[in-house]
Design a protein with these regions (language model features):
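Lipid interaction determinants
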Residues: 16-121
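Positively charged n-region of N-terminal signal peptides that target proteins for export
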Residues: 1-4, 19
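Sec-dependent N-terminal signal peptides
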Residues: 4-13
Length: 121
């Protein structure tokens, strides 16, 4: 269950101004986590600051936490307002607060708000 929560934390939705799933494809690093208005420590929670999400064109998804890799599938709603990550048979939905080619901000009621930056491999 903790691993599912780790994956859920990395999941981030997309929306705003005709952004497409093509812009989501790539590697994204978690740079900020806020819950109930307070910034949380990525390093303390994950035991590393190397926390990434990788979105592939074929719908494959990888959550990378340090040396751990968790695989899933992803899909973006037609209006780009919701990102769904499918973990085995359990879909996890994220709303999108902000998304452009280099930055994503998503929020989930359980874990808070996550900000990611796009990185080159």
């Amino acid at each position: 269950m903790k691993k599912i929560f780790l994956i859920v934390i990395f999941l981030i939705g997309l929306s705003v101004n005709a952004q497409t799933s093509k812009e989501l494809v790539g590697k994204w690093q978690l740079v900020k986590w806020t819950k109930k208005g307070k910034e949380k420590s990525i390093q303390e929670y994950y035991k590393t600051d190397q926390v990434y999400q990788v979105f592939k064109e074929n719908g494959d998804f990888e959550s990378l936490v340090g040396e751990e890799t968790h695989k899933a599938k992803w899909k973006l709603s037609k209006d780009n307002a919701e990102l769904t990550i499918i973990l085995v048979i359990m879909p996890v939905k994220f709303s999108v607060d902000y998304f452009d080619a280099n930055k994503r901000i998503i929020t989930t009621p359980q874990m808070g708000t996550f900000e990611y930056k796009k990185v080159t491999e």
